[in-house]
């Protein structure tokens, strides 16, 4: 029996007691236990702050980014091992690709941001602000790494991506992290985490891991720490109200599951490419990861006169999905993460049926594979709303599995109203070839959504899909979705850094920021700057030459010396028709 361990203060440690049993989602067999009982959580935070933080904040953005790139390459070389373990979660190869290579892709994406960052441990934020008449007193914002640790409390559905999409950002920002995956799939997180540590690429204390229950982890955070949470809205709200979070004003970034929707434009009737794209997109979002995605389509909002067409074609599409052992080449949908999750989803379906009717599903499953009878399987369920008003359960209850509800709308304004009745969602999409409809919907629904995807025939081939958050775009949403925001390229690192407004003379702020500030004193180097090596140059070095008139002969001579006859224009006729004159 495998024992899933925790990584604390540089050591792999097992928790006390028998631990929580971990079951194979496909076969239903127990293969491991996990426990975090008896761990020294205070010691974890102290080690992260004393060792990890001090090391990371001394590194420049360039060094941190290159560290991420090296780690991404290291993990990519070992990805097949992760796919094999991911099978136990009930995932197909495609499901696992999103989790594993999608997660590693976040490391690559954040590493690429080094092109926009200085070779310093900190950076400026925005333009300088002139604060005086003569220019002798100015202001400039800077971003410096916080002195604490990021505590990442993650969901069960993406044990690799959920970890890497967060740690890529905090490590680039110069802040260590304690990763707390959901226990039920922590075995996959542990496998990847072991390779991260064995790579030797990260300084001591940069990352630590708690695989079992979180217990009282939040009791140990302080005002220099950051807490991120991904999971159910109920649990997130409970943690957000924690006395320690409130007392120390600890930043709490919450990304909760939401009632995401996909809209079918009134122009996308049966027979158009957009109708086919809509059916394909909804089918994929219902079945990928067996519907266990925080971004999955929960509400299918279509014109009232197309409800029957959509119901028929979605039923046909879902009925063709083969379910079972994901090692079988024909299987397109695997198991839910555990039997408890199956029961919870079925319970939510019962509640949803009070405001809807069954279109497809809940039949006895025909599973592919010999050893699947004890697995955590559930087939796709398609409902049709009978009550679409604000008090309808379809706008309030989320079944976190392969379940979605069709809702009819009267016009685009009604579609916007229905979408916004989700009270805040991570993502919405609209499938239409009418840009006027797309514009009206986007502007009307944006206040209630963190991301909106517009899909049509022009972009479908390269579209990343409704359910895929991208590293360089923000991920999060208002209201029910948690009110948080993560990733988003350079926006993401700011959550782990302190913005400080610095005021003073331009010369002093030039030295502090290592960026020349308008009005700062010039420095005269001991010799011509062209004779200095790069490392000998300092910000503010200036060469003041005698005034002279540049002649055509000078330009011709320069072109001949540099062999630049393209940018150094020497032909007067090339100025014809331009705003320039001789």
Regions found by a protein language model. Give the residues of each.
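Residue-level signal for inorganic ion chemistry
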Residues: 28, 64, 174, 207, ...
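Short, well-ordered beta-strand elements within core beta-sheets of diverse protein domains
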Residues: 30-37, 52-57, 131, 151-152, ...
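Non-catalytic terminal extensions of PLP-dependent enzymes
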Residues: 80, 105, 109-119, 129, ...
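C-terminal core of ALDH-fold dehydrogenases
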Residues: 102, 367-381, 412-505
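Rossmann-like NAD(P) dinucleotide-binding subdomain of oxidoreductase/dehydrogenase enzymes
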Residues: 118-277, 409, 462, 484
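ALDH superfamily catalytic-core signature
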Residues: 195, 199-200, 224-226, 234-390, ...
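Hot-dog-fold acyl-thioester-processing enzymes
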Residues: 525-582
């Amino acid at each position: 029996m495998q024992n899933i361990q925790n990584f604390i203060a540089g050591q792999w440690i097992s928790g006390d007691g028998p631990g929580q049993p971990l079951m194979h989602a496909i076969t239903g067999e127990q293969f491991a236990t996990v426990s975090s009982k008896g761990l020294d959580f205070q010691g974890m935070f102290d080690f992260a702050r004393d060792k990890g933080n001090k090391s990371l904040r001394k590194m420049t953005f360039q060094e941190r980014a290159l560290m991420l790139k090296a780690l991404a390459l290291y993990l990519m070389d070992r990805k097949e091992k992760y796919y094999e373990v991911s099978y136990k979660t009930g995932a197909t190869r495609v499901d696992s690709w999103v989790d594993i290579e999608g997660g590693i892709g976040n490391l690559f994406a954040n590493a690429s941001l080094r092109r926009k960052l200085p070779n310093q441990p900190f950076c400026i934020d925005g333009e300088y602000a002139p604060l005086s008449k003569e220019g002798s007193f100015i202001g400039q914002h800077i971003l410096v790494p916080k002195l604490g640790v990021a505590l990442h409390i993650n969901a069960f559905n993406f044990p690799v991506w959920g970890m890497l999409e967060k740690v890529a950002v905090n490590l680039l920002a110069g802040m260590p992290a304690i990763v707390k995956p959901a226990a039920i799939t922590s075995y996959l997180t542990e496998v990847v985490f072991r390779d991260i540590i064995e790579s030797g690429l990260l300084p001591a204390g940069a990352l630590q891991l708690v695989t079992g229950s979180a217990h009282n982890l939040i009791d140990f955070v302080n005002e220099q720490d950051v807490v991120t949470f991904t999971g159910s809205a109920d649990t997130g709200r409970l943690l957000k109200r924690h006395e320690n979070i409130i007392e120390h004003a600890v930043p709490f970034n919450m990304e909760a599951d939401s009632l995401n929707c996909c809209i079918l434009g009134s122009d996308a009737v049966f027979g158009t490419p957009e109708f086919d794209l809509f059916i394909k997109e909804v089918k994929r979002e219902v079945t990928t990861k067996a519907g266990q995605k925080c971004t999955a389509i929960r509400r299918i909002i279509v014109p009232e006169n197309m409800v029957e067409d959509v119901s028929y074609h979605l039923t046909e599409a879902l009925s063709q999905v083969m379910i079972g052992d994901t090692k079988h080449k024909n299987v397109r949908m695997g198991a839910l993460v555990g039997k408890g999750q199956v029961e919870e989803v079925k319970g939510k379906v019962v509640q949803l049926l009070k405001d809807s009717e069954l279109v497809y599903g809940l039949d006895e499953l025909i599973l592919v594979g010999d050893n699947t009878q004890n697995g955590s399987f559930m087939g796709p369920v398609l409902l049709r709303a009978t009550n679409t008003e604000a008090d309808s359960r379809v706008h309030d209850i989320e079944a976190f599995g392969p379940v979605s509800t069709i809702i009819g709308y009267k016009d685009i304004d009604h579609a916007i109203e229905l979408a916004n009745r989700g009270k805040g969602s991570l993502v919405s999409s609209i499938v239409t070839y009418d840009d006027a409809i797309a514009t009206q919907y986007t502007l009307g629904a944006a206040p209630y959504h963190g991301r909106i995807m517009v899909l049509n025939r022009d972009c479908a081939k390269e579209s990343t899909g409704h359910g895929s958050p991208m590293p360089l775009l923000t991920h999060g949403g208002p209201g029910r979705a948690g009110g948080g925001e993560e990733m988003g390229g350079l926006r993401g690192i700011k959550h782990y850094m302190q913005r400080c407004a610095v005021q003073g003379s331009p010369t002093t702020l030039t030295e502090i920021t290592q960026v020349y500030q308008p009005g700062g004193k010039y420095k005269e180097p001991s010799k011509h700057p062209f004779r200095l090596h790069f490392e000998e140059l300092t910000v503010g070095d200036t060469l003041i030459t005698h005034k002279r008139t540049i002649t055509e002969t000078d330009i011709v001579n320069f072109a001949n010396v540099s062999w630049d006859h393209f940018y150094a224009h020497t032909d007067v006729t090339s100025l014809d028709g331009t705003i320039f004159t001789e």
